[in-house]
Amino acid sequence: MKQVKLLDCTLRDGGYVNDWEFGHDNIVTIFERLISAGVDILEVGFLDDRRTFDRNRTIMPTTQCADQIFGKLDKGNTMIVAMIDYGTCDISNLSPCSESYIDGIRVIFKKHVMHEAIQFCHEVKKLGYKVFAQAVSITSYSDRELLDLVDLVNDLEPYAMSLVDTYGLLHQDNLLHYFQLLNYNLKPSIAIGYHSHNNFQLAYSNSMEVLREPADRTVLVDATLYGMGKSAGNLPIELISMYMNTVFGRNFNVSQMLEAIDISIMPFFRKSPWGYNLFFYISASNNCHPNYVRFLMDKHTLSLKSINTILDAIEPEKKLLYDKDYIETLYRRYQSTECNDEADIQALHLCTPMPRMVPPNGFPSDLHNYHAAVLLLY
């Protein structure tokens, strides 16, 4: 039987806005308001052993650090999860789940390391955690590649596998195509998740489509308070929770979410606004990594038409894997072919010189009279 669930990832994805420095009081406020709102799953941040522990930040080197921040807070019936970007947190930094405040680990990974990442997920599962296999940049997968990943995931049998639209590229038809590939081929016990970004202003409508799609399994969507998140932002949780209350009979307390937004989120928005803008539209419309757009815009020498021309020349396999040297080469090539003035300069050298024009009575020795004489010529 289908179940629909809501996952909040404000303290993790929202951290891209403020380098995860929410401040301890805000961390507690956001956590407690979301628990009171009744969210099903709450993601409390990144586990990243390259970072040192800071109680004011939601990026932590170990699960024990997460325990220090959240351990005394009542999580009620909500599942508490953290995220690992595969390769940034060694398995030794995870305590057994039975000794941790955290219930589940979401592991994000790119296509080229999916075999290694799934093996890491097996190790996480052995520690007793609920595991979420998060396939980032889902649009980089062909159908065959995605089905190969599904085979690996079926063998893992995680709590969930998620479609991660990292750069907000998906429209309804291709989103549902990916969803159906998973729905028809994943074991029924594995939930399907969807993580959206708002580059095309489609996070809300796409999430509604995923929730409405027939499925005999659990389907969950990610959202954040006021859409706080990387680049164009995420699905606003206050919108999708209202929709889920109306259509699916859920009972999320939206007022608690609005309180958290007012108290803890709006100060960050006023300082560093997120949301749809032209920059993220250009990256999404060209199906490319936003750093390519940023690189070209920072040159301050190109029109939007020229930027689109260069982005269109990026090879498909390079589009979502940012390569600074590669885009520099494309930029220089464009400049040399489209903006090369050498031919025009040579043409000017070949032009017949214009005859020297001299006033009828010669050039005056007085400078002011000279200017006057020149004006008379025109």
What are these regions (language model features)?
Residues 1-378:
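Catalytic cores and adjacent flexible loops of soluble metabolic enzymes
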